Amino acid sequence: MAVICNTCGLPEDLCACGELAKDSTKIIIRLETRRFKKKGTMIEGLDPKLNNLETVAKELKSKYACGGTAKEGYIFLQGDHRDTIKDTLTDLGFAEESIELH
């Protein structure tokens, strides 16, 4: 017997609740200066309940060959990656309209 989603009532293989919630989140990308004037890219607005932040951070760190961390609701990457991060997040399945660059 198929498992039924509690939110939409559809079988789990047809459920699109996670994708709809992923499209409705507002992601903010900005440059942040940390200790010793080191710059880093801050990605905020990711819901840790819907997205596995460690997995997304691992994908981004391997793509940009940089260090970084995933904490409560944000991902911090070492270095300035604002010019290409929007395309990368779109490739990972986030809606382009929900990504805001500061």
Swiss-Prot record:
InterPro entries: DENR/SUI1_TIF, SUI1, SUI1_arc, SUI1_arc_bac, SUI1_dom_sf. It holds the Pfam family SUI1. The keyword Repeat does not apply. GO terms for molecular function: translation initiation factor activity. The keyword Protein biosynthesis applies. GO terms for biological process: formation of translation preinitiation complex; regulation of translation; translation reinitiation. PROSITE patterns: SUI1 (PS50296). Belongs to the SUI1 family. This is Protein translation factor SUI1 homolog. It comes from Nitrosopumilus maritimus (strain SCM1).
